[in-house]
């Protein structure tokens, strides 16, 4: 048993508590003394940056692109579709055949209807080539351009075949330039028919969108400017009951 403390002796002072920022002795490693500075709490989330982040745009859709960014995407997508599906090559070949036929017939005396048909078809083929090359049709959505192109090819094929038949029947003897011009007109008609077949393959497996030609609903008309809402009318006061009629 420990000896009892003598009477009148002062008790031993308790050890001083460690400072609040100091680490306990158990956490000391490699003889390093604990720092007096408290550690900062680790932030779980990063601070938001002041720079606005750009939204990721889809590759196969126009998304929210505007201005020049939208036109660049439309131009690239339109030319990709126009050249990969074979429409550009067919239309350019048809246009080349018609221009060559016009040059060959320029030095001969032919019926004016042949010149008219060739000039008309050159104009239509040039129009559609420029339309698809510069993506103009993407900004005119109220016209069904694939259907218009399909009808243009059908009409061009019919007109060019008719021009060949008319050119053969209108002359009994044909020189070399005239014969070459007739062959080129027929080749342009064949290319137009091939373009019709390509248009049909393009339409396969596609469904028309519902309500595509339905106009958007009109906006509800708000209150007229300068006129506030009409104040509510106060309720009419009740009429006092009439005097009771006495009996005679």
From Swiss-Prot:
Q: Where are the transmembrane segments?
A: 116-136, 147-167, 178-198
Please list the tissues where expression of this protein has been recorded.
Highly expressed in testis.
Any one Gene Ontology MF annotation carried by this entry is:
cytokine activity
User: How does this protein sit in the membrane?
Assistant: Multi-pass membrane protein
GO CC: one term?
A: extracellular space
The source's domain of life comes to Eukaryota
Location comes to: Membrane
For bias kind Pro residues, which ranges apply?
Answer: 12-22, 231-248
The UniProt record lists the MARVEL domain at 82-204
Task: Please list the GO biological process terms of this entry.
Answer: chemotaxis
User: Positions of the region Disordered?
Assistant: 1-63, 208-248
Compositionally biased region (Basic and acidic residues): 23-63
Q: What is this protein called?
A: CKLF-like MARVEL transmembrane domain-containing protein 2
- What is the protein's species of origin? Homo sapiens
Q: Taxonomic classification, please?
A: Eukaryota, Metazoa, Chordata, Craniata, Vertebrata
Q: Which gene encodes it?
A: CMTM2
